[in-house]
Amino acid sequence: MKKLLGGPGTVCGLLLRIGQCASAAASIGVMVSAKEFSVHTAFCYLIASMGLQLLWSFGLACLDVYALRGKKDLQNPILVSLFVVGDWVTAMLSLAAACSSAGVVVLYEKDIKYCNTQSQYPCLRYEVAVALSFVTWIQIAVSSHVTFWILASV
């Protein structure tokens, strides 16, 4: 198997996973701090999706730390295929959650001008949480792309 930048068991892979954890946790934190987020199904789905992404990325970051400390090779076909499936599933869930939440934010901000009339409505927090979820998705997309190419090189 090829050693690609950002693959499992590499320093760049660990940094990608830490970035995914950090941006997913930040997205959850900002969304939970917003008032009345639980009224909207898309925002609840965003929190659930980012929570799953946080757990998945944290688990793989721990595995990367284990591999780096013990000089273990994580690039065998069975492990990499598990990484590919997990990354692609969480990537699709995260993209769907980010897009649906962005749709709700655009609806409130631009279409019905709800954010302008309701000054206590936390639209800025919703926007920041959605932006962070897209940052998370970009990092997941990079990870899933790299692991897919590692699996394809077998």
Swiss-Prot record:
Task: Please list the residue ranges that the record places on the Cytoplasmic side of the membrane.
Answer: 1-10, 64-77, 151-154
Task: State the UniProt keywords alphabetically.
Answer: Cell membrane, Membrane, Transmembrane, Transmembrane helix
User: Which parts form a coiled-coil structure per UniProt?
Assistant: none
What parts of the sequence cross the membrane?
11-31, 43-63, 78-98, 130-150
Q: Which GO terms describe its cellular component?
A: plasma membrane
Membrane topology (Extracellular):
32-42, 99-129
Instruction: Tell me where in or outside the cell this protein is found.
Output: Cell membrane
Tissue expression: Expressed in the stele of the root.
Membrane protein topology class? Multi-pass membrane protein
UniProt keyword Cytoplasm, yes or no: no
The UniProt subunit note reads as follows:
Homodimer and heterodimers.
* PANTHER family according to UniProt: CASP-LIKE PROTEIN 5B2, CASP-LIKE PROTEIN 5B3
Give the similarity note.
Belongs to the Casparian strip membrane proteins (CASP) family.
How is this protein named in the record? CASP-like protein 5B2
